[in-house]
């Protein structure tokens, strides 16, 4: 086994991107490769083959590597829950909700041991590991408990590549400062540096590159130009800030809940031609001409529902449904659509307290104190009149159990559903309102197409091509071009 690790001078430098393209490159060269990010902080997660949670970014990298997503690709996942606390997930299962200080006290117990175990398993099963760090490896105030960067590289015996985003300015100083701040034993692990997201004349960089090589004794491995045609899942809320809704005639309004999660669910909609997906802040108004309104997942269903009430958006959602606009709730959004939410666990309210839902579905969701989180892959057949008979697959990540006499949306062949009954979701027969626990449902091409046709009143026409499959195919080609434009193949032994 050999290993390579990308670390960055800062967040959003391009580590995930370069890890993904390297996985895709090695896969196409016939190498058995696996991604690895020891610790990730993300609200976008999915369910791995072991029915445990991992970050969507590592699931995507696994797909680029030609592997089925595994809990060992991301052994520690931190999911922010507000008030400076995060849910800590180790090997796919939650071990508690903690502040950062509390987490630091136990980081070398279950979390670090899980990292070492996963690294060993991947090393035994694959020829190459492509690892990714988090943030910067030179955060000197937390180096003693950093299990996401060079401590991991040391354990893997990985060659480390430092990545800097040159589009933001300050990249030369960032490379120099990062390496200089590292302890000597970790500085020796850095085998080269890359500039990412470059636009312009590369020859202008040469004097600075030569000076960095002279001062640091570290090799320059190349510059990756800004790439606009490589599809990467939205990893964090910053992606929503830069997301352009486009000019499509079919308008989908996704409410940007304060603690929105799994907004990658809606990327396939945004990839379709003539479809406009916009994320609407609760402080704003829903567009009057929206063809569909979607309430997405959230880590704090009750708190986010109260925020909608505070802003008056709850009334706008109900009005939209009354006027015939399709309203869909996914996971936490589905729970909000019901008439009541009961917090038996005391996670957001005092134990046993409840709040009214939007009342668009005759459903009650209970957050029980004696039941754990559901994390499971699911598949089934849709029951809705406009979507009936469509086979779908996805995954469930939820703590609530929903009780309803409304018709079910999906009859599951595998999974959990509303309350372990193999019936998922619900819909109204007299209004276009529906809800589901299935994340990833829009990655099912036929469901996506029929949904768009329905909400648009038949004016949307599906393309002959599969936009998601086409994007993946394009990714593989772009990956070859990117890696071969640098000195990475030499470092990889290719």
Swiss-Prot record:
Q: Which SUPFAM superfamilies match?
A: Class I glutamine amidotransferase-like, P-loop containing nucleoside triphosphate hydrolases
Is RNA-binding there in the keyword field? no
Example GO molecular function? ABC-type vitamin B12 transporter activity
Q: Which residues form the active site?
A: 331 (nucleophile), 439
Under InterPro entries, the record lists:
Class_I_gatase-like, CobQ/CobB/MinD/ParA_Nub-bd_dom, CobQ_GATase1, CobQ_N, CobQ_synth, GATase_3, P-loop_NTPase
Source organism's superkingdom?
Answer: Archaea
The question of whether Lipoprotein is a record keyword is answered with no
Q: What keywords does the record list, in alphabetical order? A: Cobalamin biosynthesis, Glutamine amidotransferase
GO biological-process terms attached to the record = cobalamin biosynthetic process
Which segments constitute the GATase cobBQ-type domain? 249-447
Pathways involved? Cofactor biosynthesis; adenosylcobalamin biosynthesis
Q: Which PROSITE patterns match?
A: GATASE_COBBQ
Similarity comment text for this entry: Belongs to the CobB/CobQ family. CobQ subfamily.
NCBIfam families referenced in this protein's UniProt entry, alphabetically = cobQ, PRK00784.1
Identify the HAMAP family for this entry. Answer: CobQ
Role noted for this protein: Catalyzes amidations at positions B, D, E, and G on adenosylcobyrinic A,C-diamide. NH(2) groups are provided by glutamine, and one molecule of ATP is hydrogenolyzed for each amidation.
This one is known as: Probable cobyric acid synthase
What gene makes this protein?
cobQ
């Amino acid at each position: 086994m050999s290993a390579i690790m990308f670390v960055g001078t800062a967040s959003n430098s391009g580590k995930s991107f370069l890890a993904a393209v390297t996985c895709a490159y090695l896969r196409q060269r016939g190498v058995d490769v696996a991604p690895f990010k020891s610790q990730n902080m993300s609200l976008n997660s999915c369910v791995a083959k072991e029915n445990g949670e991992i970050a969507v970014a590592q699931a995507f990298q696994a797909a680029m590597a030609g592997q089925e997503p595994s809990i060992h690709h991301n052994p520690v996942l931190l999911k922010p829950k507000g008030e400076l606390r995060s849910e800590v997930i180790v090997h796919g299962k939650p071990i508690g909700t903690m502040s950062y200080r509390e987490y630091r006290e136990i980081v070398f117990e279950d979390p670090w041991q899980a990292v070492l175990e996963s690294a060993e398993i991947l090393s035994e099963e694959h020829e190459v590991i492509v690892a990714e760090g988090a943030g910067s490896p030179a955060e000197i105030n937390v180096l003693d408990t950093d299990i996401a960067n060079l401590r991991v590289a040391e354990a893997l015996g990985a060659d480390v590549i430092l990545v800097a985003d040159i589009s933001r300015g300050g990249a030369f100083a960032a490379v120099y400062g990062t390496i200089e701040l590292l302890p000597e034993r970790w500085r020796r692990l850095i085998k080269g540096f890359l500039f990412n997201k470059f636009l312009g004349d590369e020859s202008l960089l040469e004097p600075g590159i030569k000076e960095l090589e002279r001062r640091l004794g570290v090799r320059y491995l190349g510059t990756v130009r800004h790439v606009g045609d490589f599809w990467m899942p939205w990893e964090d809320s910053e992606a929503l800030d830069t997301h352009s809704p486009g000019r499509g005639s079919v308008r989908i309004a996704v409410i940007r809940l304060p603690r929105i999660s799994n907004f990658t669910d809606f990327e396939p909609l945004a990839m379709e031609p003539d479809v406009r997906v916009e994320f609407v802040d609760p402080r704003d108004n829903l567009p009057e001409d929206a063809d569909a309104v979607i309430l997405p997942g959230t880590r704090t269903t009750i708190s986010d529902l109260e925020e909608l009430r505070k802003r008056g958006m709850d009334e706008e959602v109900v009005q939209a449904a009354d006027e015939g606009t399709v309203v869909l709730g996914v996971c936490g959004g589905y729970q909000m659509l019901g008439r009541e939410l009961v917090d038996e666990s005391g996670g957001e309210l005092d134990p046993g307290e409840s709040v009214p839902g939007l009342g668009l579905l005759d459903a009650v969701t209970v957050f029980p104190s004696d039941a754990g989180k559901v994390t499971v892959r699911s598949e089934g057949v849709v029951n809705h009149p406009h979507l009936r008979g469509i086979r779908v697959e996805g995954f469930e990540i939820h703590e609530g159990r929903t009780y309803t006499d409304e018709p079910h949306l999906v009859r599951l062949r595998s999974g959990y559903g509303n309350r372990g009954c193999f019936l998922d979701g619900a819909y109204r027969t007299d209004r276009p309102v529906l809800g589901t626990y299935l994340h990833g449902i829009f990655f099912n091409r036929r469901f996506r197409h029929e949904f768009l046709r329905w909400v648009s009143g038949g004016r949307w026409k599906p393309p002959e091509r599969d936009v998601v499959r086409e994007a993946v195919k394009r990714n593989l080609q772009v990956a070859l071009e990117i890696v071969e434009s640098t000195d990475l193949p030499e470092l990889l032994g290719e």
